[in-house]
């Protein structure tokens, strides 16, 4: 049994220095105050290994006690519970953080627990060999995996879908260049905002090039960069590079960096208010259109430069 309560000694009280008589007291519980953290454990656990603690509780070293009988150890008590677990049964669950493992190893060295020191050294070496990159971009393998990534993310999400195999026609002259520019912009944004936004790639989706933006598990906007145009007597696929719009939507998702809590005002900040809907729209139509903002790029004919569509913002 252990605790983490800070002990405030009474004013004027002085610790008592004495030798601990541990003979025949293996099952006796002792009270330890390690840097203000309080622990109860048995003498048997403290003397199982040949450590400094065994020397303290076998009478070979003097110990300090306060007037309430707590044995004082002038060390940080943060990892002492972990040390006790190791002393009891030689097993341990190490912290995930490299820094905390280093802290634990420093305490193990102080108490001369060589087995625990070796375990920490091995774990640190393994972490060094399996170094995780600072900017880690997952490539999704299924819709289920995508849903889980987005739902579990504590950050806003930006997804780039690009899949040339979905194309049924030839490309316009600038499409390949624009596709590369979209990918390059994705990489640039990943390097710039990887600490604040989760960037994911999708190479199995049904589009050729499409950006999606999510906040608090909800899809906020979509920028579709492809369209079908007519050149002479055949159809062609056109890929655009709406750089300004992509930057705008990426900055918009940063509004959703806050912890995932219900925040209707934030969710409505980038969506059209109900009062702006035309009177002719019924409730079902409004709910459908209010679901997500989709942005389609300008579409031009490569045959006679007639504009087939215009830049529009609507909800799907």
From Swiss-Prot:
It comes from the Eukaryota. The modification Phosphoserine is found at residues 278, 280. GO terms for molecular function: cyclin binding; identical protein binding; small GTPase binding; ubiquitin-protein transferase activity. It is found in: Cytoplasm; Nucleus; Endosome. One of its GO terms (cellular component) is nucleus. Residues 268-279 have a biased composition (Polar residues). Pfam families: BTB_2. Residues 268-288 are annotated as: Disordered. GO terms for biological process: cell migration; immune response; negative regulation of Rho protein signal transduction; positive regulation of DNA replication; proteasome-mediated ubiquitin-dependent protein catabolic process; protein homooligomerization; protein ubiquitination; stress fiber assembly. Keywords: Cytoplasm, Endosome, Nucleus, Phosphoprotein, Ubl conjugation pathway. Signal peptide: none annotated. Component of the BCR(TNFAIP1) E3 ubiquitin ligase complex, at least composed of CUL3, TNFAIP1/BACURD2 and RBX1. Interacts with RHOA; with a preference for RhoA-GDP. Interacts with RHOB. Interacts with PCNA. Interacts with CSNK2B. Belongs to the BACURD family. This is BTB/POZ domain-containing adapter for CUL3-mediated RhoA degradation protein 2. It comes from Mus musculus (Mouse).
